[in-house]
Amino acid sequence: SHFIIISPEYNGSFPGVLKMLFDTSRSHEIWFHKKALLTGVATGRAGNLRGMDHLADVLNYVKITVHPNKLPISAVNSVVNSDGKIIDNNTLKAINQQLDEFILWASLQTQPSNH
């Protein structure tokens, strides 16, 4: 199982409701040894870089392996239109590259044994 998490910036991190999801779920059964791809979005210039780092720490704690290419999307209101469609070609290319890398990376990873 794989997860793609697109997280907005919230006070320099990721939203607390997302942390609550990990805190209140049955971590071992749901999250352990899964893989995740992170994309951060923000209206500012950093694209939620700090939030993705915080989130990666939480994910690593619950034994989710995080893909190394975390994509920050800055000034999201200028790359996405009011219908939610991406209108910036460079952003679209970066997203497609990240997804292609994740698909390849996830397919090469092996599941740990249950010894």
Place the predicted regions along the sequence by residue.
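Helix-loop-strand module that forms the ligand-binding subsite of alpha/beta enzymes
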Residues: S1-V62
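Glycine-rich phosphate/pyrophosphate-binding loop and the adjoining helix
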Residues: T65-H115
